[in-house]
Amino acid sequence: MAGYRKLGLPTDQRRAMLRNLVTSLLKHGKIETTVTRAKETRSIAEKMITLGKRGDLHARRQALAFIQEELVVKNLFDNVAPKYAERNGGYTRMYKKGPRRGDGAEVVILELV
């Protein structure tokens, strides 16, 4: 059994999509996506916030290797991570929004707490 969801995509496309979703979540504070994509995004975003809490140069470079925009990484380390200094995990929340009109896929809103 795999430790991650394949989401019906080849590895490079799946990785690119998750990088985009995590970058958008950290940039805007919330995103709207399907349940399975949100669960994968949540896992990675929480790891990025934990890197931000660590705050050293190596953690910043690890975050830069995944997050696509340098300004988002700067915001993560300067604003987002300090907000969660006292919290051990559970930085995100998911709300069910209902089925998507086009294909009936269950849509959720994933946001930072």
Swiss-Prot record:
Q: Which GO terms describe its biological process?
A: translation
Q: Name one Pfam family in it.
A: Ribosomal_L17
Please give the superkingdom of this protein's source.
Bacteria
Which keywords, in A-to-Z order, does the entry hold?
Ribonucleoprotein, Ribosomal protein
One GO CC annotation, please?
Answer: cytosolic large ribosomal subunit
**One term of GO molecular function:** structural constituent of ribosome
InterPro entries from the xrefs? Ribosomal_bL17, Ribosomal_bL17_CS, Ribosomal_bL17_sf
UniProt xrefs under PROSITE patterns = RIBOSOMAL_L17
Q: Does the keyword Ribonucleoprotein apply?
A: yes
Which family, according to the similarity comment?
A: Belongs to the bacterial ribosomal protein bL17 family.
What subunit structure does UniProt give? Part of the 50S ribosomal subunit. Contacts protein L32.
Q: Which PANTHER family match?
A: LARGE RIBOSOMAL SUBUNIT PROTEIN BL17M, RIBOSOMAL PROTEIN L17
Give the HAMAP family listed for this entry.
Answer: Ribosomal_bL17 (MF_01368)
- Recorded protein name is Large ribosomal subunit protein bL17
Q: Which organism is it from?
A: Clostridium botulinum (strain Eklund 17B / Type B)
Provide the organism lineage as a comma list: Bacteria, Bacillati, Bacillota, Clostridia, Eubacteriales
The gene for this chain is: rplQ
